């Protein structure tokens, strides 16, 4: 399975902005990145799984929208997040 409850909780703990944070853009992007990474590995062995590929493209688009929102709202938080997740070179 891609995202166990334990893994999800660890990601939330790492990227939360306050104690009861589960929905901030940072947390959402971290969770999406984890799912995207899992699906990318899945496609290395299942090249013809086009239904899941469409889901991957939707996840990438959603992550892109969240990152754009964060960049427009607070550039420093955006830069910190992409550095922590290793999204840009």
Curated annotation (Swiss-Prot):
Cystines in this chain: none
Alphabetized InterPro entries for the sequence: Ribosomal_uS15, Ribosomal_uS15_bac-type, uS15_NS1_RNA-bd_sf
Pfam families listed in its UniProt record: Ribosomal_S15 (PF00312)
Keyword Ribonucleoprotein: yes
Listed GO biological process terms: translation
Domain of life: Bacteria
PROSITE patterns on file: RIBOSOMAL_S15
Stored Gene3D superfamilies: 6.10.250.3130, S15/NS1, RNA-binding
Keywords, in A-Z order: Ribonucleoprotein, Ribosomal protein, RNA-binding, rRNA-binding
GO CC annotation: cytosolic small ribosomal subunit
GO molecular function, one term: structural constituent of ribosome
Record note on quaternary structure: Part of the 30S ribosomal subunit. Forms a bridge to the 50S subunit in the 70S ribosome, contacting the 23S rRNA.
Role this protein plays: One of the primary rRNA binding proteins, it binds directly to 16S rRNA where it helps nucleate assembly of the platform of the 30S subunit by binding and bridging several RNA helices of the 16S rRNA.
Homology family: Belongs to the universal ribosomal protein uS15 family.
Official protein name in the record: Small ribosomal subunit protein uS15
Record organism: Desulfatibacillum aliphaticivorans
